[in-house]
Design a protein with these regions (language model features):
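Blade-edge motifs of beta-propeller repeat domains
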Residues: 1-5, 43-64, 95-118, 149-172, ...
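Short loop/turn segments that connect beta-strands within the blades of beta-propeller domains
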Residues: 6, 35-37, 86-87, 140-141, ...
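Beta-propeller blade termini
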Residues: 8-17, 26, 67-76, 121-130, ...
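Hydrophobic beta-strand segments that make up the repeating blades of beta-propeller
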Residues: 23-27, 82-86, 136-140, 190-194, ...
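Short glycine/acidic-enriched loop and turn motifs that connect beta-strands
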Residues: 28-32, 89-90, 143-144, 197-198, ...
Length: 257
């Protein structure tokens, strides 16, 4: 099934509790309703090693454009909550009022996260300071990166802006960040998609006092324009795969070897 995602990211997680990865994906502007974007839930009806995605429903959100979802347990109750980036409204926080296998995402009106610069927010969650709670990184239209440290707890997150030009990162236009530990050393690699389709990689060089990343020029990967990468092991073969939206529509899968 080819979906007009155009520039938006897919998010992967086990959303029905059956042990394989399901998918949320969005479009830039919904062709059936030009007043908003739309988010779709695709269930993996295949297996962990041979995924087959079928569209089951769309997830109702607020009206805006350029939805960009990311998932994580933000309130410590064992199920997945959701942050959704937008064109011009910042980032919405959706608490899962359902369960791990039957999620019900409800907007927390007091949980909005606003940007100090840029638009087209593209959030991703990672415990980057290794303190047990999820921190927030946000790509945006200028091509730079916003870092919000979680100064709350695993049950009550509170995101405090550390820098809206984190590590002087600038990919040109339309930064889309995601994390992975590609060499299993306990440190994260930061991958950032861009408007040109080039994906840059930065390696974690944290100290006890500071979160820090350094660009690795040896890594090179170019996709279609407006790359929105996610790195997951989609077929459970122990190797990370890259899934990206693009300006031409649809999702592009690159399997790790």
């Amino acid at each position: 099934h080819l979906l007009d995602t155009r520039r938006r990211r897919a998010a992967f997680a086990d959303l029905d509790g059956d042990g394989d990865l399901d998918m949320l994906t969005t479009n830039k502007i919904d062709p059936e309703d030009n007043a908003t974007s739309r988010m779709f839930y695709f269930e993996n009806t295949g297996t962990k090693t041979h995924p087959v995605f079928h569209q089951r429903s769309h997830i109702p959100l607020f009206e805006n454009y350029h939805y960009a979802p990311t998932l994580g347990d933000l309130d410590g109750d064992g199920d997945l909550d959701m942050l959704v980036g937008t064109w011009n409204k910042g980032i919405g926080f959706f608490r899962n009022q359902g369960t791990r296998s039957k999620p019900n995402f409800v907007l927390d009106e007091n949980g909005w996260i606003t940007l100090t610069r840029g638009s087209n927010s593209a959030p991703t969650l990672q415990d980057i300071d290794h303190d047990g709670d999820l921190d927030l990184f946000v790509g945006e239209s200028s091509g730079e990166l916003n870092f919000y440290r979680n100064v709350g707890t695993t049950k009550n997150p509170s995101f405090e802006l550390v820098s809206d030009r984190f590590a002087d990162i600038d990919v040109g236009r339309r930064s889309f960040p995601t994390f992975a530990d590609i060499n299993a050393d306990g440190k994260y690699e930061l991958f950032i998609g861009s408007e040109t389709g080039k994906i840059l990689m930065y390696r974690e060089e944290n100290s006890k006092e500071e979160v820090s990343f350094k660009h690795d020029p040896a890594f090179s990967l170019s996709l279609n324009n407006y790359a929105t990468p996610s790195l997951v092991d989609i077929n459970a073969d122990g190797k990370l795969d890259v899934i990206s939206g693009s300006i031409s529509g649809g999702l592009i899968f690159y399997y790790g070897r």
